[in-house]
Amino acid sequence: MKILENNKINLSLLNNYILQPKIFEKGTDKFWDDEHISEQMLNLHLNPDIEAASKTKETIDTEANFIIKAIDMKKGKKVLDLGCGPGLYVREFAKTGATVTGVDISERSINYANENIKPGYDNILFIKKNYLDINFRESFDLATLIFYDFCALNTSEQIALLSKIYEALKDNGYFIFDIVT
């Protein structure tokens, strides 16, 4: 059912979209595939001047360069970017020659990344998947979770994700994430 159908507004459906969720209330994956929401989220990701769905271009460049230097990212390294959105960090990591896998739940973001970030790079793979459902084994030198995603998870999801990331990392691998304090 759509909010606007046959020139009529479905007020109860509209109300569902404007209700503020309780803290750590479980949402649905369908949120990310809603045509209007996913389009607006992608537009926000791609706006280099505001921090709404992604960080500003200047911040992305600064953080990516810090991460690249901190782990000596180069060809032969394998990187997992969880919640990669349209691949803004993936692109920066791939420039080093590292093999980079980006995972995101939004089909629109993954499609954008495949069409606009991946061309010219044979060392990038984008996967449309909820990162809570990943199952990699000792594959990566680095896993990242950027833009405060960890804070949006409830405690059991945080524990489950940390376990999955631990399994995905090689011995002595790194997990870099940011939180709001």
Describe every region a protein language model picked out.
Residues 2-32:
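N-terminal auxiliary segments of SAM/dcSAM-dependent transferases
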Residues 86-97:
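Conserved SAM-binding loop of SAM-dependent methyltransferases across substrates and taxa
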Residues 106-108:
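Conserved SAM/SAH-binding beta-strand->alpha-helix loop
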Residues 113-114:
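Conserved SAM-binding loop
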Residues 119-132:
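Conserved SAM-binding strand-loop segment of SAM-dependent methyltransferases
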Residues 135-142:
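A short acidic, Gly/Pro-enriched loop at the edge of an enzyme's catalytic core
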Residues 159-171:
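A short glycine-rich, Lys/Arg-flanked "PGG" loop and its adjoining helix->strand segment in the class I
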Residues 172-179:
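Conserved beta-strand signature within the Rossmann-like core of class I S-adenosyl-L-methionine
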